[in-house]
């Protein structure tokens, strides 16, 4: 059985995966919830939901939202899963984990931040093909320009009081944009 367990960002398993991940993130900015992925008692990886991206092509039109609704969109900012003993425990495991995560983080996000989740977004860097998102019926809505941003020490004017953002407009890394509405579960009357 898939079991997602909320962890801190400093979880030793997560820190180890961050070093192996293709992006090698140093941390996460904004709001986020980290979840360890278990099947029965075996650890398979981590999945993290965080604040949505500020500027994302076609996202606002897809969800029919504006900036006031950004707190209701969760970005799948990190997903790293590895086989145990050379295999996954069940068929389509990565997609089933993604679905379980969507269901669980919608509840966890509301409890932690007080915001009802209306949808999800994820940015996939080629050559990755987003197959697991396609199997989970996410919609492809476009491609980013590929700008990257990192935080360094210092101060910045505006809404970001901690650290200074440094943008890279030259070494572009465009990403595929996938989104999905929250699925409304039918209730019995």
Indicate residue ranges for each PLM-predicted region.
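Short amphipathic alpha-helix that is part of the acyltransferase structural core
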Residues: 1-31, 36, 43
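Conserved beta strand-loop-helix elements of the APE1-like EEP
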Residues: 175-186
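Residues that cap or initiate secondary-structure elements
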Residues: 10, 82, 128, 184-186
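Acyl-donor binding region in acyl/amide transferases
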Residues: 33, 48-177
């Amino acid at each position: 059985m898939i079991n997602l367990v909320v962890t801190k960002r400093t979880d030793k398993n997560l820190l180890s995966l961050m070093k192996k991940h293709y992006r090698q993130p140093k941390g996460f900015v904004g709001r986020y919830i980290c979840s360890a992925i278990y099947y029965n008692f075996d650890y398979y990886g981590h999945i993290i939901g965080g604040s949505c991206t500020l500027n994302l092509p076609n996202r606002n039109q897809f969800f029919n939202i504006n900036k006031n609704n950004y707190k209701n969109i969760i970005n799948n900012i990190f997903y790293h899963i590895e086989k145990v003993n050379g295999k996954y425990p069940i068929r389509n495991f990565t997609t089933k984990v993604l679905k379980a995560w969507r269901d669980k983080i919608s509840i966890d996000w509301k409890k932690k931040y007080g915001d009802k989740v209306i949808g999800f977004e994820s940015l996939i860097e080629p050559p990755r093909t987003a197959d697991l998102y396609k199997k989970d019926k996410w919609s492809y809505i476009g491609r980013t320009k590929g700008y990257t941003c990192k935080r360094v020490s210092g101060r910045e004017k505006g809404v970001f009081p901690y650290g200074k953002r440094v943008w890279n407009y030259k070494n572009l890394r465009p990403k595929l944009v996938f989104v999905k509405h929250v699925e409304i579960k039918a209730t019995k009357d």
